[in-house]
Amino acid sequence: MPLNAGLPVMFDREFGFLNRLLVAPLRSRSSIVLASVIYITALSLLQSLAIMGTAAVLGYGWPGISGLALVLVTLLLLVFAVTALSLGLAFALPGHIELIAVIFVANLPLLFASTALAPLSFMPTWLGWLAALNPLTFAIEPIRAAYQGPLDLSAVLLEAPYGDVTGTSCLLILLVLTIGLFLAIRPLLNRKLS
C-alpha cells in the first residue's frame, strides 16, 4: 500500500485538482503532502493490525505488548520510508504510467530479494548479499523476532554476509532511511508545490 501512495497525488496532478489545492489559502502547502502521508500511514497500520488479528484468531500467535510496540514502530518507519519514496517519485516522474511502471518493477524484486520468504542461510551468496542490503529485510527481522518470543533488541537478528545485525541496528537503519528519504524529497516537494 505505501508504495502506491504517490498514485493519488499523481492523478490529482494530472487532472488539475492539485493546482486547485495549491491556489487555495492554505497555511502551508506541505500540508497537502503531510495529509497524504498521515492517511497512508493510518490505513497501512490498520490493515496490518487486521492481518495480525486474523493471524492470532487462526492460531498463529500474537506478539505480546512489547512485541506489538516493536511491530508498530517497525511498520511505522517502513511505511514512512516507502511513502516518502513514492511521493517523491510522484512529483519527479511526468505521469502515472511511469509511476506505475516503477512501482511494478520495484515491488516484486523488493519482496523476493528480502528475508520475507526465506532466511539468508537458504539463499545463494549473491542473493544473500542483496537481501542483507534490502531495507525490507531490516523491517522483517524485528517483526519476526517480536513473534518468536522474549523481545531482546540487542540480540542478533540477521547474520548478514558483512556482519551481525541486531534489532536496534535494524530500527536505526530504518530510521536513517526514513529521514534520508524525507530530506531527499523535500527540495523536490518545495519546488513542485511553490
Task: Place the predicted regions along the sequence by residue.
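Transmembrane helix segments
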Residues: 90-137
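Helix-loop-helix units of permease transmembrane domains in multi-pass membrane transporters
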Residues: 8-39
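Short, membrane-exposed interhelical loops at transmembrane-helix boundaries
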Residues: 137-166
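Short amphipathic alpha-helical coupling elements at transmembrane boundaries
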Residues: 16-23, 91-94, 128-132, 141, ...
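Alpha-helical transmembrane segments and their short interhelical loops
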Residues: 28-29, 33-104, 163-186
